[in-house]
Amino acid sequence: MKNLLYISALILVLFACKKTEVTTKAPPVSSNITEASTTSDSAANVFIYDAMKGYYLWADQMPSLSSTAIKLKPINYFYTLLYGYDTIDRFSWMDTSATNLTNQLNGINTVLGIKYSAFFADNTQTNVVFSISYVLKGSAAEAAGLKRGDFIYKVDGKQITVSNYQSILQNQTLSIELANYANGVYTATGKPFSITKTTLQTIPILKDTVIEWAGKKVGYLNYIQFLNSFDDSLRAVFNRFKSYKNSGIDELVLDLRYNGGGYVVSSDLLTSLIVKDLPSKVGTVMSKKVYNNAYTAVLRKEANSDQYFITNFKSESANLGKLNRVFILTSPGTASASELVINNLKPFMDVILIGEHTFGKNVGSFTITDSKKRWSFGLQPITFKTVNARDESNYGTVNGFLPDYLVKDNVIPFKPFGDPTETYFGKALSIISPVAYKANALEWRPTPRATQVNNLPLGDSRIMDRKEMWIEHKN
């Protein structure tokens, strides 16, 4: 077997994995990679082609090598190989730096540390405000005192408009001015402050809490990326849920509206922590992976078992055990590993989706780099499809999973996570106990709904919203 590729296969939805008890064993590297002798673009492209031919899920749909534009720059050549790029294959990508690619997949980014939505500031639909959805822990934004629900009104002294809102936060250091909001009017505070982007590790648990609601103990978890380095932190949250007031929580609301994926092993862990009656399921099928025909043959030859194709439930002491249902808050930002949790739970319990449709990514990847370090780029092509224990995987469309309860996240200002008056969480509580919700609603003043400019990722969100599912794959 030629030692030409370093393949990290992190079953992320994003899938990234660490060597823990839940790590999926990496499939072996195929031996069909052509060894190039030069560092020219053409040689790099031959390497890319052979790697894609060996591992790409749609390898059978690729053009012949001789018919490709072999002299293109590698970053351009890669995308010419994709099957139905941006329609069928909406997900494969390449970075000129494998280091940058790996850092992104592991939640290490240089950012302000905010996710935000753009809303029109007035009826002219010319001026724009950024409403902060969340602030990363340990970020420059948190240090500056920014929080969910704040409105960014000016940047570097300029009003945010439909002409500049997609690029106005690109500089490394920025002067930001917030706005107060009252009676449908935004008013600048007149107190700008400076903030500089920093490189930080995403801490994926934004909020976990338990509230008492109509005689029930309701657990709430907002989780924004599946990072295996935080698996023990996730277990700790569920241990708190399980032991709350001795008998544990009665209902779980899992907020994945901002979770674009991550490590498959971490997605599998979350599934195991939630699923009802885990002990009876240990050793049975949770999910399966489907590869291209050629790579399937390689894996079958490598192992006599289904270890590369089937993921079974594993024992987890923090499993909640008794829940008959789970409420999952979703949006178009709910993707890949997040959708994997939804799909894997559906055969075993009632999964109630609240919000908007999910992204629609039922496929994953592993990272391909040149182990001889002739080229520094990293490839992240789609290499497998996932199905659940019932062989279901029918959410791989632009509509993803449709919600059971459609809710728009456009009530401003955004309320804190875990607050009963917060739009998504409040809807879940209204289903848990409609009577209690109606009684409390009499005390809650209605808030206006804003008109969103679009739902495209902006600024930090472009970086933090990478939607992936991968498995770690090393030779």
What are these regions (language model features)?
Residues 2-8:
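Sec-dependent signal peptide recognition
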Residues 13-16:
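C-terminal motif of bacterial Sec signal peptides marking the signal peptidase cleavage site
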Residues 18-251, 276, 447-475:
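Flexible, low-complexity junctional segments that flank or bridge functional domains
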Residues 157, 257, 331:
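Flexible loop residues that form catalytic
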Residues 199, 258-260:
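Active-site-proximal loop/turn and secondary-structure-junction residues that shape catalytic pockets
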Residues 225, 230, 238-239, 244, ...:
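C-terminal "post-core" interaction segments
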